[in-house]
Design a protein with these regions (language model features):
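Acidic, surface-exposed loops and disordered segments
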Residues: 1-187
Length: 187
C-alpha cells in the first residue's frame, strides 16, 4: 500500500557507507521521475548521477545537513553512497517549481521500495557544487538527493505544543514530530 511506502520513506541522514549503489539503480530511480507527472509535460528537470567515493566526498563538502541539528553532518562511514543532483536547464522553458518536488518524491519512494533511504537537501553551496561537478553554465542546481542504505532509526510522532523540530535521542533515534491531520485540514 502507498501509505506503507510513504511511512518507510523518511529523511535518512546516516547510511552504511560500506554498501555502494550501482549506477544502474540510480538510472532506475531517475526513470521513475521521468515517468512521473510534469507541468505542461515539459520534463524540464535534468539529473547528475554520482556513486563514486571521491566525487561523493566532494559533493558532501557542499552540503549542510539537518538544519535543526546545528553543526551536525554524517560521520565518516555513515555518509551517502550516491547522489542525484537535480538541475534546471536555464535554456529551456520550465515548470521546475513543481516538477522538482514531484521528481524527488518519485525518486525517494522508489529508493524506499528498494530498501534504500534518502534525504532531499536544499541547503547546498550551489556555486561550489557547480564547480565541483564541472557543470555547464546552462544548469542551475535545484536539489541534491542523498541516497544509501540507512543505518539509523527514524520515528514519526505527534507534535506537542506546536513544536515540529526533529531531534535525536541519546540512543541515536531520529524523532520527527508531525502536525495532526485536523490541524492541516482547514474546513
Amino acid at each position: 500500500m502507498l501509505k506503507d511506502l510513504i511511512l518507510k520513506n523518511r529523511s535518512y541522514r546516516r547510511f552504511d557507507e560500506s554498501r555502494s549503489i550501482e549506477r544502474e539503480v540510480l538510472r532506475e530511480l531517475v526513470d521513475l521521475a521521468r515517468l512521473s507527472a510534469s507541468g505542461a509535460n515539459m520534463q524540464s528537470v535534468r539529473f547528475y548521477l554520482s556513486n563514486g567515493q571521491e566525487e561523493n566526498n566532494a559533493i558532501n563538502e557542499c552540503l549542510k545537513w539537518a538544519g535543526y541539528l546545528k553543526g551536525w553532518s554524517p560521520a565518516e562511514g555513515e555518509r551517502a553512497t550516491a547522489f542525484i543532483v537535480m538541475l534546471k536547464d536555464k535554456e529551456r522553458k520550465s515548470s521546475t517549481a513543481y516538477d522538482e518536488g514531484i521528481a524527488a518524491q518519485s525518486i525517494l519512494l522508489g529508493a524506499a521500495e528498494k530498501g534504500l533511504g534518502g534525504c532531499m537537501l536544499g541547503a547546498v553551496d550551489r556555486e561550489k557544487l557547480h564547480a565541483v561537478l564541472g557543470l555547464d553554465e546552462k544548469y542551475e542546481i535545484l536539489l541534491v538527493v542523498a541516497l544509501g542504505y540507512p543505518c539509523e532509526t527514524v520515528v514519526i510522532e505527534e507534535a506537542k505544543d506546536n513544536d515540529i523540530k526533529y531531534w535525536r535521542s541519546e540512543d541515536g533515534v531520529h524523532h520527527v514530530p508531525k502536525r495532526s491531520l485536523d490541524e492541516l485540514i482547514v474546513n
